[in-house]
Design a protein with these regions (language model features):
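Positively charged
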Residues: 1-179, 191, 198-203, 209
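Extracytoplasmic/periplasm-facing segments of secreted or lipoprotein envelope proteins
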Residues: 188
């Protein structure tokens, strides 16, 4: 079984180049292998072919359900939001990025477009505490899935989180020290001023949502 190439230790010539398009049949075979690698590692939610040394426009994701991307293309994008993300190919590294809160994509294996959105539903949080919690958790998962889609498509186009990095400190006024941000560790969500949230986010455990 192939392994994810650690780009801090090994050269991966495919990491920074657009990958070639493949047939649906070949893409499905590659996707099967990628899922096996991802499931074996148990520390990631998405994987692109070039991360294991395969030159093919194929990636897989498993957040809410397994998703296969073969030759994916953007059809439509939503509003940009701040995010904080890492990468299996750059272990221990996480950076602030800007991502779309919704995307519509087209893949080679599907006739219809796919819509992914992490934006709140109009009825989210309107009735009952338990419903609010369910809606909040569902929104966080939908947003994570939407960001992961973009992360993997970046890989297929020769981009990575370092290409998407934005500096989120008071020095460049991306986020003011007294500006409130929402952060999550996957279990709990908090709304804090950036001056209190910054150290939590930089620890890598918490991320901006």
């Amino acid at each position: 079984m192939k392994e994810v190439i650690n780009c801090f230790k090994e050269n991966n010539p495919l990491f920074n180049k657009p990958l070639k398009e493949v047939s649906v049949e070949e893409g499905m075979e590659i996707a099967k292998e990628l899922f096996e690698i991802l499931n074996e590692r148990k520390d990631g939610i998405g994987l692109a072919a070039n991360q294991v040394g395969i030159d093919a426009q194929v990636a897989v994701i498993n957040v809410r359900e397994p998703i296969i991307l073969i030759n994916p293309k953007y059809v439509e994008t939503g509003d940009e939001i701040p995010y904080y993300e890492g990468c299996l190919s750059l272990p221990g590294k996480a950076v602030h990025t800007k991502r779309y809160n919704s995307v519509v994509i087209k893949t080679a294996q599907d006739d219809s477009n796919w819509y992914f959105s992490g934006a709140p539903n109009p009825t989210d949080g309107q009735t009952g505490w338990e419903k609010q919690e369910r809606n909040k958790n569902d929104q966080e998962l939908r947003l994570l899935e939407t960001v992961c889609i973009q992360h993997e498509i970046d890989h297929l186009n020769g981009l990575n989180i370092m290409d998407r990095q934005v500096i989120s400190t008071i020095t460049n006024k991306k986020i003011g020290r007294n500006e409130k941000v929402t952060i999550t560790d996957g279990q709990e969500t908090k709304e804090l001023k950036w001056k209190k949230a910054e150290s939590l986010v930089e620890s890598g455990v918490w991320k901006i949502v």
